[in-house]
Amino acid sequence: MAKFMTPVIQDNPSGWGPCAVPEQFRDMPYQPFSKGDRLGKVADWTGATYQDKRYTNKYSSQFGGGSQYAYFHEEDESSFQLVDTARTQKTAYQRNRMRFAQRNLRRDKDRRNMLQFNLQILPKSAKQKERERIRLQKKFQKQFGVRQKWDQKSQKPRDSSVEVRSDWEVKEEMDFPQLMKMRYLEVSEPQDIECCGALEYYDKAFDRITTRSEKPLRSIKRIFHTVTTTDDPVIRKLAKTQGNVFATDAILATLMSCTRSVYSWDIVVQRVGSKLFFDKRDNSDFDLLTVSETANEPPQDEGNSFNSPRNLAMEATYINHNFSQQCLRMGKERYNFPNPNPFVEDDMDKNEIASVAYRYRWWKLGDDIDLIVRCEHDGVMTGANGGVSFINIKTLNEWDSRHCNGVDWRQKLDSQRGAVIATELKNNSYKLARWTCCALLAGSEYLKLGYVSRYHVKDSSRHVILGTQQFKPNEFASQINLSVENAWGILRCVIDICMKLEEGKYLILKDPNKQVIRVYSLPDGTFSSDEDEEEEEEEEEEEEEEET
């Protein structure tokens, strides 16, 4: 007969649940767990190879942090016995062996600690894979990803050299990669049509200037004529009888080296009958020398800061004018060309006129283009045999070596001049290419470069001359990787495009933020003196209205 056994009921008046542990479960260890944990945590060998860190600990849990199931090695005191503690001399092999054993013990201890806190241990092969993945990821981001996006954010949109109006029509567009492929070899030897002006001789004492014997840059008040093509009386006279394309060396150098430019610039083109005239706008910034234009991080200060792009350009132009005259033997004997300076009036003092000579040269480009260019020399130099060499004098200026990956000229110019010129070529590639093209067009034997730095980084009004350097234009062109064939190819391409246009006025404009130049057709009266007078009158009327 079945017998009913009354169960033992535990009464817990002060709480909920049993108040004592049953006998069969008294010595059994227990560790809290979660029924929501994923299965497979024990045998997860793939966790070390996860590329996304979000899935590295997908089997981890907030439970299981206890040490109920952890194994701890306890020493058995029953086996304790006294031993001889006398120290014996150990061999080098034994010392190294103990050192490796201690390192292995520390590694095992760290591994046990990581297991205790559910940290994932990567095997040796997985560690190497992870390091290789991180290295490749950083390399990729440095070359293509993060760095490029950061540069795009840091670059501010640049302003155009002239405001493009709504009634201007785009006639042609040329991108720089296309222009860089141009080549033209059918260029005849230049012929001198007329030479004007007078040049002062170069003072060779400036070749001995070093950073230890620096020389202050003086402010020399002389008149520099920057007359555009159509205002030149000699070109007007020559245009009646010969030539069908006319320009100045500065304008042609801008076009021939345009693929290196970053800032915006513009050139006015006038098609009169079968003739082309390349001009610059009046009161434009065309003659200002840019500073660090092609650097990775060009100057971006705004407002009245002396390190803003425009103020730096004005400072560089000021330095270039003063150095080109200070390094000459001013007030002494001059080298006179057959004709006088066409821009100097009879009542003007010759000592107030800058040392400059104009050489009007003629090139034959193929069978249909007769190019006449006004080129310039800045000085003359006597050689060892008493011969005369014409030179172009230009100036590189240091404004702050901490910017644009610059090099401190006072420390490197004498010992590592190659590093200085390499940095300048990187930061001012377009400016150096323009100067080289001007020297090649003029036929100058040498290109003199002066190194001028600020007296103090924060003072843009005082400067010192730290040294000079001399180059032959052809050799310097190869050093700066300037292809003369490509330069003539770009010029021939621009001339052919303009020759296909109808008679009128056009504008060649470099896009301020893209590697593109465009040709715009301009309405009648654009950039004329009458239009400028009307704009000035409108500005004066607006100022009077504001005052009232």
UniProtKB/Swiss-Prot annotation:
Record protein name field: Eukaryotic translation initiation factor 3 subunit D
Assembly and oligomerization: Component of the eukaryotic translation initiation factor 3 (eIF-3) complex, which is composed of 13 subunits: EIF3A, EIF3B, EIF3C, EIF3D, EIF3E, EIF3F, EIF3G, EIF3H, EIF3I, EIF3J, EIF3K, EIF3L and EIF3M. The eIF-3 complex appears to include 3 stable modules: module A is composed of EIF3A, EIF3B, EIF3G and EIF3I; module B is composed of EIF3F, EIF3H, and EIF3M; and module C is composed of EIF3C, EIF3D, EIF3E, EIF3K and EIF3L. EIF3C of module C binds EIF3B of module A and EIF3H of module B, thereby linking the three modules. EIF3J is a labile subunit that binds to the eIF-3 complex via EIF3B.
N6-acetyllysine modifications at: 53
Domain notes from UniProt: The RNA gate region regulates mRNA cap recognition to prevent promiscuous mRNA-binding before assembly of eif3d into the full eukaryotic translation initiation factor 3 (eIF-3) complex.
Cellular compartments annotated: Cytoplasm
Species this protein is from: Macaca fascicularis (Crab-eating macaque)
Ranges for region RNA gate: 285-299
GO BP, sorted A to Z: cap-dependent translational initiation; formation of cytoplasmic translation initiation complex; translational initiation
Function: mRNA cap-binding component of the eukaryotic translation initiation factor 3 (eIF-3) complex, a complex required for several steps in the initiation of protein synthesis of a specialized repertoire of mRNAs. The eIF-3 complex associates with the 40S ribosome and facilitates the recruitment of eIF-1, eIF-1A, eIF-2:GTP:methionyl-tRNAi and eIF-5 to form the 43S pre-initiation complex (43S PIC). The eIF-3 complex stimulates mRNA recruitment to the 43S PIC and scanning of the mRNA for AUG recognition.
Predominant place of localization: cytoplasm
Single GO molecular function: translation initiation factor activity
Family indicated by similarity: Belongs to the eIF-3 subunit D family.
